From Swiss-Prot:
Was named after 'sesquipedalian', an unnecessarily long description of a simple thing. This is Sesquipedalian-2. One of its GO terms (biological process) is endosome organization. A motif (F&H) lies at residues 223-235. Residues 17-121 form the PH domain. It is found in: Early endosome; Recycling endosome; Golgi apparatus, trans-Golgi network; Cytoplasmic vesicle, Clathrin-coated vesicle. It comes from Bos taurus (Bovine). Its main location: other.
Amino acid sequence: MKLNERSVAHYALSDSPADHTGFLRTWGGAGTPPTPSGAGRKCWFVLKGNLLFSFESREGRAPLSLVVLEGCTVELAEAPVPEEFAFAIRFDAPGVRPHLLAADGPAAQEAWVKALSRASFGYMRLVVRELESQLREARHSLDLHRRSSWKAVSSRCKPQAPDRWSPGLENGHSLSRDCSPMGLVEEGGSRPAGRGLAEWELQGPASLLLGRGQSPVSPETSCFSTLHEWYGREIMELRRAWLQRAQENQPECKDQDRP
C-alpha cells in the first residue's frame, strides 16, 4: 500500500475529530524501537477512522508511525513487563510483525481494544448489513400492523341494514348510518323524478343551512321526529312556493284562451 506522506501527516494533525486518544506503551513497530530496559516506549496514540497514529508527545507535530487497521485482529496479550495491561494487533498477512501495546489500566485496555476492533471497514460493513436487516424486519412488522389495523377498522365500519323507520331518499338527500360519532351521515343524492327543475333549485331553510356547512344532524337532533320536523319545513316551503307560482300563472293562461 502506497500513501502520500504529506497527506497522511496533514490528516493526522488536522482538526478532524479523533475516535480515540491516549498514552500507550509500545514494543516494536515502525518508528518505535524497543528501549534498552525492555519497558517499552510511551507514546501518544490517535485513532482516526481505520488509521492509528503515534506521536512522541501530545504536542508532537510529526507522527512517528502509522498502522492501517485492515485485515487484522485485536486481542489481549502478555506484556514483557509485569503489571502492564497489554494487547496486540495481529495481521493475517504473512511476515508482518504484530504490534504490542499496553495501557495504564484495565479500563483503558478495554476501551482501546473495543475502539481498535471496530475501526476497520470490514466491521463497518457488518454493522451496515445488520442495520439493513433490522430495518427490513421493522418495515415488514409495520406493514403487517397497518394491514391488521385496516382490517379491524374495515370490519367495524361495515354498512348495516337500514332500520324500519329509515326514510331512504328524501328531499335529494339520503340518510345512512356510518361509524362516525354522529351516528348519521348525510349523502347528496340526485334530483328525484317528477320534480321540476325550478322546484328542485329552490333553496329552503334546511338546504341553505346544509350549503353553509350547518347540518341538523347532531347528537341533540339525531332522533327521527326532529329530523322529520326539520325536513318538513323545507317541504312546506316548496309546496307554498309551488302554489304561489301556480296562482300567478293562471291569469296568463286565461288571457291566452280568449279569442
